[in-house]
């Protein structure tokens, strides 16, 4: 099989792409992309893996499924393309980041600076139908098996990983993580529906950097650049 993730994630995940569930998922996606507008476009489904190679992952921020408004999703949890409106959950993430570390909010939602430092921005479901009331339309079709495998492989690495789990869906993944060797930070989701129930004040960013320092790793510079341009994010597809 020709690689369609172009770094060391490929040998980690290639066995999953050979399994029957992924073949079913691929057939489902072919139909969906033919008949509906799907987020993200098929060339950016695996951007999270492209941006943050397996061996360089220090932190995982786990999301659910992509944003489903036009032009926002590009394959990374909570991140949106420059020039699109910052979603409410990310606005709240920026608020907590400012309260936690004094980091100044920016006028974009493009989180590549974090990914470049080893923060894997992973959704548990990698595609969704575009439009109103289309959240979770690709749930239960196989993506969860692939991303669960990615979480398990990271958990089993000799180098510890910090898993940031926001909300009940993300927190349910703790069963995949060896909590004896990795670090898990949990809180309610940053959505406006739940942010005031414990996300605000949870200090995930400072806690992450304290943990990284204790592990002998370089802390994350959470301050995003004020100006960004879109990089060549990914050339992957759904082979």
From Swiss-Prot:
User: Which GO CC terms are listed, alphabetically?
Assistant: cytoplasm
Membrane in keyword set = no
Q: Where is the active site?
A: 65
For this protein, the record's SUPFAM superfamilies field holds: Uracil-DNA glycosylase-like (SSF52141)
Catalytic EC class: hydrolase
Q: In which family does this protein belong, per the annotation? A: Belongs to the uracil-DNA glycosylase (UDG) superfamily. UNG family.
* Protein's UniProt name: Uracil-DNA glycosylase
Query: What species was this sequence derived from?
Result: Levilactobacillus brevis (strain ATCC 367 / BCRC 12310 / CIP 105137 / JCM 1170 / LMG 11437 / NCIMB 947 / NCTC 947) (Lactobacillus brevis)
State the encoding gene.
Answer: ung
């Amino acid at each position: 099989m020709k690689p369609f993730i172009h770094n060391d994630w490929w040998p980690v995940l290639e066995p999953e792409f050979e399994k029957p569930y992924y073949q079913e998922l691929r057939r489902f996606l072919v139909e969906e992309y033919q008949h509906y507008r799907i987020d993200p476009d098929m060339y950016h489904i695996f951007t999270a893996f492209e941006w943050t190679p397996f061996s360089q992952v220090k932190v995982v921020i786990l999301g659910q499924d992509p944003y489903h408004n036009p032009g926002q999703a590009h394959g990374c949890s909570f991140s949106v393309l420059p020039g699109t409106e910052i979603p409410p959950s990310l606005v709240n993430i920026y608020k907590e980041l400012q309260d936690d570390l004094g980091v100044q909010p920016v006028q974009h939602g493009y989180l590549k600076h974090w990914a470049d430092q080893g923060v894997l921005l992973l959704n548990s479901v990698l595609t969704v139908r575009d439009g109103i009331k289309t959240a979770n339309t690709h749930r239960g079709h196989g993506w969860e098996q692939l991303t669960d495998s990615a979480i398990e492989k990271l958990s089993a690495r000799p180098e510890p990983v910090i898993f940031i789990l926001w909300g009940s869906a993300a927190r349910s993944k703790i069963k995949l993580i060896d909590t004896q060797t990795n670090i898990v930070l949990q809180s309610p989701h940053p959505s406006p529906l739940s942010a005031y129930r414990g996300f605000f004040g949870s200090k995930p960013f400072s806690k992450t950097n304290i943990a990284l320092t204790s592990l002998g790793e370089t802390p994350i510079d959470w301050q995003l650049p004020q100006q960004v341009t879109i990089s060549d994010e990914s050339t992957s597809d759904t082979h």
